[in-house]
Design a protein with these regions (language model features):
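Catalytic machinery of carbohydrate-active enzymes
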Residues: 1-174
């Protein structure tokens, strides 16, 4: 991770960024789960399928959770696919700007994410984050920081089953 990389440069003190300046005073945690189902343009190989995200969304909706889908306009097709399969999911692309996204994460109980940039911001909230990633040198060396980041990896992210994610969710939200 980043701390190990800094140690190789003989930098032994690491200060976790304080993002509290991004918050407004109205932080009310509710039964919502944030999904980050996208990845960068060149990161298609990092994406867990829309179908699997939708299956997890259905599971959570049955347990009375709201599902907020976040990302950029590049993720609109993915988000629409999830909404088509789980219409109760809520498109929050317009609240995915960095200054809104951190606040949104702080009001959630859980964040489910691919290996993508916003996952690192989500990790800094110290909320429970399930990070779905390929098991390779890059993801092993650069994963989200945070005390509650739960890494689920496979040699190919597409091989990670819905059951594995649901089992982890059950452990976290019990």
């Amino acid at each position: 991770n980043q701390q190990d990389q800094l140690r190789h440069l003989s930098i032994n003190q690491f200060i976790r960024p304080d993002l509290s300046w991004m918050l407004n005073d109205d932080i009310k945690v509710s039964k919502k789960v944030i999904f980050i189902p996208g990845a960068s343009k060149s990161g298609e190989y990092k994406k867990w399928s829309s179908d699997k995200f939708a299956q997890v969304a259905k599971y959570l909706v049955l347990r009375k959770y709201e599902i907020y889908l976040t990302g950029s306009n590049l993720d609109l097709n993915t988000i629409n696919e999830i909404i088509q399969l789980c219409p109760e999911s809520i498109n929050k692309i317009n609240e995915s700007k960095i200054e809104d996204f951190y606040q949104l994460c702080m009001t959630s109980e859980l964040i489910l994410t691919n290996d993508t940039g916003p996952a690192h911001i989500a990790g800094l909230t110290n909320k429970n984050v399930i990070w779905i990633a390929n098991d390779n040198d890059i993801s092993r060396s650069c994963y989200p920081l945070g005390d509650n980041v739960h890494k689920i990896t496979s040699s190919n992210v597409k091989n990670i089953s819905v059951d594995i994610i649901i089992n982890k969710i059950e452990q976290i939200l019990k």
